[in-house]
Design a protein with these regions (language model features):
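Short, flexible helix-loop junctions that flank or precede catalytic/ligand sites
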Residues: 1-161
């Protein structure tokens, strides 16, 4: 019974694995306008965004003997979490759709998976291309943007058979 989830779960955690750039051969380059736009869009909703300067650089995979000419060596997780507090518990019981739960959790100030990934891109851990391969960066955190996305007055329970 999905209504018991809210009272029995403490934390919801999502993860994706990105390949880690090889420290021996990764190559830096200044941000392009397109890269800066993608990063700025994602960071716009970040609760404590890293500073993006004119001198900020990104790194790309190159390939060498250490990484078997792939440009990557190892994997690391990008994460997002939702603490199940009273607001999230109520959302899970009322309407357990992802966008409703994330909207209820927004006040927690926990970075989204895209935001965590961008932090790893800016630190040189992985490349923007690699992050885009595993995480949808087109919208940052899923948020309600129109009335059509909001739950109806009847809520989810009225549609359960």
């Amino acid at each position: 019974d999905y209504r018991m989830i809210g009272s029995s779960v403490n934390l919801i955690l999502g993860q994706r694995l990105v390949r880690v750039l090889c420290t021996h051969c990764k190559q830096s380059h200044p941000l392009t306008d397109a890269e800066r736009k993608i990063i700025s869009t994602v960071l716009a909703t970040h609760p404590a965004p890293p500073v993006l300067t004119k001198e900020s650089v990104l790194y790309d995979a190159a390939g060498c003997d250490h990484c078997n000419h792939t440009g990557f060596k190892g994997r690391q997780g990008v994460f997002e979490a939702v603490r199940v507090d009273a607001a999230v518990e109520e959302a899970v019981i009322r309407d357990p759709r992802e966008n409703i739960i994330l909207e209820a959790a927004k006040a927690q100030g926990i970075p989204s998976m895209a935001e965590d990934g961008i932090e790893k891109v800016l630190s040189g851990t992985t490349s923007l291309t690699e992050l885009q391969r595993v995480v949808d960066l087109s919208s940052g955190r899923h948020t309600l943007t129109t009335e059509d996305d909001a739950a109806s007055a009847d809520d989810f329970l009225s549609h359960v058979v």
